[in-house]
A protein has these predicted regions:
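Active-site pocket-lining segment
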Residues: 168, 201, 211, 273-342
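Short, well-ordered amphipathic alpha-helical segments that serve as non-catalytic structural scaffolds
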Residues: 34-50, 74-78, 103, 163-170, ...
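Condensing-enzyme catalytic core mediating Claisen C-C bond formation in acyl metabolism
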Residues: 2-34, 224-287, 291, 298, ...
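Conserved catalytic cysteine-centered active-site region
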Residues: 63-117, 157-162, 220-245, 326-353, ...
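Active-site-proximal alpha-helical scaffold in enzymes
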Residues: 95-125, 171-200, 252-259, 346-365, ...
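N-terminal extracellular/periplasmic Venus flytrap/periplasmic-binding protein-like
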Residues: 18-20, 31-35, 39-40, 48, ...
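Flexible glycine-/small-residue-enriched beta->alpha junction loops
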Residues: 118-173
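Conserved beta-ketoacyl condensing-enzyme motif
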Residues: 30-118, 124-142, 205-215, 283, ...
Length: 389
């Protein structure tokens, strides 16, 4: 107390990053138990880095729909299912769609604090097996109340709270038209197809039973086909074509201290530079990445043009359009290999998948700084700046 000497935090490095290919709903991964899906990513990370798994201090795994096979601490169950040491604990995180980005934050913070040296940050979600929203609908069928109490209703009323309405409200407040959303969505598919054809994802994917290519991108989609889809509601701009796909997948990253890098002979891919998280309007729900990006850049003493690559989750096309307009970030540098509209959004896995994509894209291009941000249920967003090393 009273010391004028500031504590110097340790640095956290990403020493490994892998992901599964992303499966479509009822696609190639739909028959894989999510515990085994997560286990595959964890085992792939251990094999890729060559780390002694017993040296890992903790496993932090994001997962949104924690019911059925995704409950009972799937982080622990996936680690054990991978045949990895019982001595290593695991904890499961729910910050909605940003769950495994938050896992990266928690892992980095543990390393930066000096309390841990080697932490796995991961994410998993099987939306084919555990349907989106089932944690609420099944509970209500069993007689349990909705996850909004008296205080919530007194504050926000009984208006609809959903990601779909949030996306439409963004269109209305920012003035986006359906044609703009569809043009953005088409570009996402085209970028993803190009990335697949050029093999940009090959080194980051650990194939599962021969499945090693993202199956969401549509090669034959067009503005004409998108225009033929019905909107979610008659007077809305939002259609299925401009929303992220329901998907299955998993990802895992190894976060290490500088001492752990030396001790275990690890080669870092990136340094965790800056962490930020914000709350935002829970009714709009999806605008948090705007303020999270600003907060991360301000904390880092950087400007938007200092970032070489952005990974911004494409929950819906208007999320990216509003984010770009308000932050000044160019969409040319955002999601260069396609986003969730084309590749899919396996909820709790997406944060780890986006971070893996970001790390590898910086390695591929030689860029220095990357920023990842995601909108999250409840009106929240994480932002992470990493630096290639």
């Amino acid at each position: 107390m009273g010391s004028q000497t500031e504590a110097v935090m340790a640095e956290a490095f990403i020493a490994g990053a892998v992901r599964t290919a992303i499966g479509k709903r009822n696609g190639s991964l739909s028959g894989v138990n999510p515990v085994d899906l997560g286990a595959h990513a964890l085992r792939g990370l251990v094999d890729r880095t060559g780390i002694d798994p017993a040296a890992v201090d903790d496993v932090i795994m994001g997962c949104v729909s924690q019911i059925g096979p995704q409950t009972f601490d799937i982080a622990r169950n996936a680690w054990l299912s991978a045949g990895l040491p019982e001595s290593v604990p695991g904890v499961t995180v729910d910050r909605q769609c940003g769950s495994s980005q938050q896992a990266v934050h928690f892992a980095a913070q543990a390393v930066m604090s000096g309390t841990q040296d080697l932490v796995v940050a991961a994410g998993v979600e099987s939306m084919s097996i555990v349907t989106m929203g089932s944690t609420v609908t099944l509970a209500m069928q069993a007689g349990m109340p909705a996850p909004f109490g008296t205080g919530w209703r007194e504050r926000y009323g009984d208006q609809e709270i959903s990601q779909f309405r949030g996306a439409q409200l963004i269109c209305e407040q920012w003035g986006f038209k359906r044609s703009q959303l569809e043009e953005f969505a088409l570009e996402s598919h085209q970028r993803a197809v190009r990335a697949i054809d050029e093999g940009r994802f090959d080194s980051q994917i650990v194939p599962l039973d021969g499945f090693g290519q993202d199956e969401g991108p549509r090669r034959d989609t067009s503005l004409e086909k998108m225009a033929g889809l019905a909107p979610l509601r008659p007077d809305w701009e939002i259609t299925a074509a401009v929303a992220s796909q329901i998907s299955d997948g998993a990802g895992a990253l190894l976060i290490a201290s500088e001492a752990a890098l030396r001790r275990h002979g690890l080669t870092p891919l990136a340094r965790v530079h800056t962490l930020a998280v914000v709350g935002s309007d829970p009714v709009l729900m999806l605008t948090g990445p705007i303020e999270a990006t600003r907060k991360a850049l301000a904390r880092a003493g950087m400007k938007v043009d200092d970032i070489d690559v952005f990974e911004v989750n494409e929950a819906f096309a208007p999320v990216l359009l509003a984010w770009s307009q308000d932050t000044g970030a160019s969409l040319d540098r955002a999601n260069p290999n396609g986003g969730a509209i084309a590749l899919g959004h396996p909820l709790g896995a997406t944060g780890s998948i986006l971070m893996t994509k970001l790390v590898y894209e910086l390695q591929r291009t030689g860029g220095r700084f990357g920023l990842q941000t995601m909108c999250e249920g409840g009106g929240q967003a994480n932002a992470t700046i990493i630096e290639r090393v």
